[in-house]
Each structure stands twice: as structure tokens, then as C-alpha cells.
Amino acid sequence: MSIKAIVVDTAGTTTDLNFIQDVLFPYSHQVMASFLAQNQQQVLVESCINDVRDIALEPSATVARVAEILQIWITEDRKLAPLKTLQGLIWKQGYSSLAFQGQIYPDFIEAISRYRQQGVAIYSFSSGSVEAQKLLFSHSEVGDLTPMFSGHFDMRMGNKLDKQAYLNIHNTLGLPPKQILFVSDTQEELTAAQAAGMMTCLMSRGDAFAPTEHKQVGSFTALNI
């Protein structure tokens, strides 16, 4: 059964993990307090602030305290919806001001065109919000790549380590799971996708190939459909 859709992880797969860890995360940590102070009246920001209070079990937390909690979560790389939403809003400002540009691996840029020419649809799946993914790909160093994608998925599909997230994705796409290939640098995510019936491929960039039950490549150049 031929592959009709490829779902790609972002950090470590299409995007240098160092860009996420050394540029995007520190930027959101640095400006979080001022961003909340300036935008706390916006409906979405206010909703995220209240969600942080609920998750942290601090219903009376000040906005400054909420910022501190979020900064701790950034340091801990917590996969929590209000944090990811706020990071997306903050990164939007950073991209717009040209504080940074999205760093996408050249082999993926080449491959995405090749796959589309073969009639294969491309989607991304990240713990970062859909908004953050669109920002990453629309403000890349080579320009706007979003027209090359057929869609994006985030934590609203479920936790990336849970089988249900991948069941939700293939139900959304309306394709048999065996026609969907999930590519990630994290074996636990691939195992969850495999349990949902998807085809899988481990992206091992710059490392010796690891023992795995999944197909394994060192770049998208080697991933032929």
C-alpha cells in the first residue's frame, strides 16, 4: 500500500534542535514577563493566564507570578497547552521583528518538493502549537514554506507519546494508517504511531544509527517514497 501522506516531527527532524533550545526557548523565557504584562487584557492571553493558575493550583497568582511559573516550565520543557500557546504568540513577535528566522534542514526543503511532486501530502506534528509551526515554516531562512504543507497538528490531537494522538491524526486525514508515514527523531513517538498502525521512520541526524525496530535514515535525502 503506497504512502499518501507524510507526517513530520519538527525539532530534531525538520529543524535543528539547537535552534529550538538555544534561540526560541530562551527568547520566550526572556520576554515572558513583559509580554504578559503588556497583553494580559487580550482574551487569549487572559485565558492562558487562568489556565496556568489552574494547572499550578495557584488561583490567586499575580500576572508576575504566572510569568515565573511559565519560565520554570520553559526551563523544564513542559508540554502544557497554555505555555505552548503563549510561546507561539511571543515567537510571532520575534519572527515579525526579525529577531530570528526559522532554521530548516536543507535536505527537508529539497525533499518536501520531491514528495509533493510524487503526490504525497506533507503534515507536521509538534508539541508546539499549530501557530508556532506555521511561524517556523513561514519565516524560514529560505522564505515561506507553508504552501508546501497540507496541514499541521499539535497537542489538540493528543500527547505525542500516546497511540490515541496518531489514531486521531489518521481519522482526521481520512486515510488508512498504513498510507501514512510518521518521521521523528524520538523512538517513543514512533512506537506510539506504529501502535496506531502507521508506517514509521527514525531520523538519526549526526548520530550513529541506534538499535531500533523502525526504518532509519540520516536525512530526508535518504528517505525515498
From Swiss-Prot:
Pathway: Amino-acid biosynthesis; L-methionine biosynthesis via salvage pathway; L-methionine from S-methyl-5-thio-alpha-D-ribose 1-phosphate: step 3/6; Amino-acid biosynthesis; L-methionine biosynthesis via salvage pathway; L-methionine from S-methyl-5-thio-alpha-D-ribose 1-phosphate: step 4/6. It catalyses: 5-methylsulfanyl-2,3-dioxopentyl phosphate + H2O = 1,2-dihydroxy-5-(methylsulfanyl)pent-1-en-3-one + phosphate. One of its GO terms (biological process) is L-methionine salvage from methylthioadenosine. Keywords: Amino-acid biosynthesis, Hydrolase, Magnesium, Metal-binding, Methionine biosynthesis. GO terms for molecular function: 2,3-diketo-5-methylthiopentyl-1-phosphate enolase activity; 2-hydroxy-3-keto-5-methylthiopentenyl-1-phosphate phosphatase activity; acireductone synthase activity; magnesium ion binding. It holds the Pfam family Hydrolase. Binds 1 Mg(2+) ion per subunit. The keyword Metal-binding applies. Belongs to the HAD-like hydrolase superfamily. MasA/MtnC family. Monomer. Bifunctional enzyme that catalyzes the enolization of 2,3-diketo-5-methylthiopentyl-1-phosphate (DK-MTP-1-P) into the intermediate 2-hydroxy-3-keto-5-methylthiopentenyl-1-phosphate (HK-MTPenyl-1-P), which is then dephosphorylated to form the acireductone 1,2-dihydroxy-3-keto-5-methylthiopentene (DHK-MTPene). This is Enolase-phosphatase E1. It comes from Shewanella denitrificans (strain OS217 / ATCC BAA-1090 / DSM 15013).
